[in-house]
Amino acid sequence: SVIMYSTGNEVSETAQKKGIKLCENLTETLHVLDGTRPVTCGINIFFNFLSSMGLGVYSDKKADQTAKDVKKKKSVGSEFFNELAGVLGADFMKTGATLYPCDVKTKDAFAKMDVAGYNYGIKRYRHDLKKYPNRIILGSETFCADAYKFIEMAKEEPRIIGDFVWAGMDYLGEVGIGSWEYK
């Protein structure tokens, strides 16, 4: 069964005005097509903030420049961020997500959807539920080590509605791995 729709996962455009408007348009379109189900988008809160500073995976300017410079230097993309997480450990994303600028760069996008999809944002749940009394949170990506902690929070707070844990998979790859800009 379809329980909700998602407009994307780890799309860093949601840190920009253009991306927030796109998120709103996609949500409205899905509501017109099916008004019975909520809409979410999985946002990696910390990476969304980095994107707002020009360090994100995608941007119009970066795409144009990458096309020109593809042979000059390695692109910073999904592969880079996965390697960074491997070096720094899982906690850096969760802790980074608690920074005030991360809230500033996600609040407008979250306001355009029915369910806020938090990728690795478990350390924000309690704070954000107080700050945004109408927000419903979905753990759209969570580390295995946080599964029990998540369940305990969800038992206490009905606005935390579910969780997707990266546990094991038949890896088909990140959306960008293997694209023309990678090695």
Regions found by a protein language model. Name each.
Residues 1-183:
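Extended substrate-binding grooves/exosites of carbohydrate-active enzymes
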